């Protein structure tokens, strides 16, 4: 990397030399979007050596006045960038400039001296047993009922529920009788950008679902969880084990009825045609 290089050119090298090795598809999509939408338009043409602490402070001020860019067709919910998004931009640049120091492009990291914005972490609302019971009693959709039970009884996240496959569900008579019924969480379902998948290859991706509309910029994928600690065995209460058995039975009946029209991905929570 030349010592006299612009921020834009350096970040391009940073993404290809560092990001493609270290980031998963979600992080790659997020970080490249931050670079394209908020970093390059503001400081991309500057020389790396010209980015001093005062430049960083001015850039920070500019971010606070910046309008969010529409993402994947979704309109922004706020008029200005949120502190959480500004924090993401600054952390990304801090990481990039740290590599610039390591690669001897610059002598020191001007982003080390930035005070990150105060991000208000709203406490999660915890549902009471009564609210959970009411929600389950009022649920008329069998698929949603199964998903809600997995969320409440097993504390599974949405991606984990949608990525759960029957081969990881242990609900035999013997399992239930011995209080040994469980699900094994080793993957999650998420949506990733097509460009990120093409750039990174299928690292940590188990399956890419064929899109219904081929020209879309994203793909639904089954992937390895972000951290190894997320891979775990979760025990099932007997009531939920029986709910899952009934759901499997009805899913198999539908599969038999639809025949070849059913797209069998072995998903526990799937659309009537088997797709996620």
Regions found by a protein language model. Name each.
Residues 11, 22-41, 56-57, 74, ...:
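Non-catalytic DNA-binding core/recognition domains of DNA-processing enzymes
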Residues 1-54, 247-264, 270, 274:
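N-terminal DNA-binding module of tyrosine recombinases/phage integrases
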Residues 49-64, 112-117:
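Short, conserved phosphate-binding/catalytic loop or strand-edge motifs used
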